[in-house]
Amino acid sequence: MVTDLARTVGDLARVVRHCSGAILMGMDGIPVEQVVVAPGTDLEAIAGEYAGLLHEVRALASELECGAAQRFTIRGMNHRVVFAFAEGDLVLGVQAASRGLSGQIRYAVSRAMSEIGEQ
């Protein structure tokens, strides 16, 4: 299963245009699998920094009766980070340059999430 997860994360990193890295992590911010594409990308720091915020996103979605949180996107001047919540405590994240195509990133993340759900 770990090999399949590694392949899924690797495929996500290769498919997303201008991707700097992809990570499958626990809600605690601990990486399960990660693929760094661009030198200098620190996915472990991203996982650690966003872990608390992802907990808040999940809680807020529940509190506002939105249903289960599915995705969370951070758009900055230099980078875009998209997180998708898997079943249990897993989160899939991908970081791309701000010029990455939003629709293409969402589609690639959705495909990767369906693969993770099948494993």
Residues of each region from the PLM?
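Non-catalytic interaction/Regulatory regions outside core domains
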Residues: 1-119
